[in-house]
């Protein structure tokens, strides 16, 4: 009977390979090395099983060694939420399976498709040890570097990436709340609008688009767009040049890029013919859609910002000689948008775009074992429309 390569079922992509070679053992060898066994001649299958058992015992010793190393690295487990969990290695609980390479690859591909959790569970290669922890927790305890030093170098790459990942889902929500509270305190920002709400908010100011297209309204965003065009040697904006742009100059601050792009698409749908017929080299270089999203949309949102935050021109904005010494409302709004880009990226862009998405958001927060009332975007809204 030929022996197939045996593989051990483990956590992660890679499985342990146990290649059984030269498994023919005679009675004398068996009795001398293992007196407890019967004097009956062992078959090839029995020999294979016996070799696997030896490897399991070695694996158990290695597991205990790694376990002690990690416990020493942590120094203190009591009083923290860190847990070291070890699967039992006892009679009948070690599973061995025979698989082909193609089956192993399928398992590996399926493992890669699984989303990362807020609490990472790492399977150390060649062991049955699992280390459960949150990276945010490790940093506060000053143990992040210690655990990395104890992780085997041959650890599966995907699992290693989960260890050094700076923010997990849970950590991000904590960071998001900090940013939201900080910017709301400093700037007293209005609530983050849903898709339909922001479209309704821009409708009264759509005439500004006509003024911009006719060049009757000065635009800081247009000036930045023109400068990008002048710095280019290409006839149109390439993907490489777009990635190299400092998009913070073209983002409408606390509204976030997702909502800004929705506004840009709305503008393009209404004024498509006018935008496509523009003779401006800057507009042609950007292209109609990007020009709508990164030049016209933020200018339109400046007008919405003025209304939401109650901004007004300074009394001395214009003097008798028509030379302003104060600041205009649009200038104030532009400054606020530039100062709140981080809020837009971290908070607005990750807040629900539709009312019904709030339920999904809160379910995710609950799964992460965080306070729903504290971390939900619902808390920061004045009046939440009915979720249908």
UniProtKB/Swiss-Prot annotation:
Primary subcellular site in the record, as a coarse category: cytoplasm
Physiological role: May be involved in a process influencing telomere capping.
Compartment(s): Cytoplasm; Nucleus
Domain of life: Eukaryota
Chain residue ranges for the region called Disordered: 22-58
Alphabetical UniProt keywords: Cytoplasm, Nucleus
Protein family according to the UniProt entry: Belongs to the RTC4 family.
Transmembrane segments: none
Name of the protein in its database record: Restriction of telomere capping protein 4
């Amino acid at each position: 009977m030929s022996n197939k390569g045996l593989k051990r079922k483990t956590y992660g992509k890679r499985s342990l390979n146990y290649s059984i070679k030269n498994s023919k053992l005679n009675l004398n060898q068996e009795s001398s090395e293992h007196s407890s066994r019967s004097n009956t001649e062992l078959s090839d299958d029995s020999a294979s099983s016996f070799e696997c058992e030896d490897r399991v015992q070695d694996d158990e010793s290695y597991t205990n060694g790694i376990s002690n190393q990690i416990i020493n690295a942590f120094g203190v487990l009591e009083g923290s939420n860190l847990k070291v969990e070890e699967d039992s290695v006892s009679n009948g609980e070690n599973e061995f399976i025979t698989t082909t390479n193609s089956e192993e690859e399928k398992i590996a591909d399926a493992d890669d498709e699984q989303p990362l959790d807020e609490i990472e569970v790492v399977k150390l290669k060649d062991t049955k040890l699992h280390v459960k922890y949150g990276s945010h927790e490790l940093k506060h305890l000053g143990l992040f570097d210690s655990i990395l030093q104890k992780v085997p170098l041959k650890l599966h790459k995907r699992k290693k990436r989960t260890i050094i990942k700076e923010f997990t889902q849970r950590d991000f929500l904590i960071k998001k709340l900090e940013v939201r509270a900080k910017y709301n305190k400093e700037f007293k920002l209005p609530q983050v609008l849903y898709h339909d709400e922001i479209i309704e908010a821009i409708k009264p100011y759509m005439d500004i688009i006509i003024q911009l297209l006719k060049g009757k309204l000065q635009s800081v965003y247009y000036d930045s767009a023109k400068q990008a065009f002048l710095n280019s040697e290409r006839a149109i904006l390439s993907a490489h040049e777009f990635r190299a742009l400092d998009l913070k100059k073209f983002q409408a601050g606390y509204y976030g890029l997702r909502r800004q792009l929705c506004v840009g698409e709305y503008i393009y749908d209404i004024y498509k013919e006018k935008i496509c017929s523009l003779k401006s080299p800057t507009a042609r270089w950007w292209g109609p859609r990007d020009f709508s999203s990164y030049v016209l949309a933020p200018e339109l949102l400046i007008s919405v910002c003025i209304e939401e935050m109650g901004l007004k021109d300074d009394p001395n904005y214009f003097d008798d000689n028509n030379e302003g010494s104060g600041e205009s409302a649009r200038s104030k709004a532009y400054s606020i948008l530039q100062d709140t880009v981080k809020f837009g990226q971290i908070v607005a862009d990750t807040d629900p775009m539709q009312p019904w998405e709030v339920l999904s958001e809160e379910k995710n927060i609950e799964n992460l074992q965080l306070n729903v009332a504290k971390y939900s975007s619902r808390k920061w809204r004045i009046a939440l429309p009915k979720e249908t």
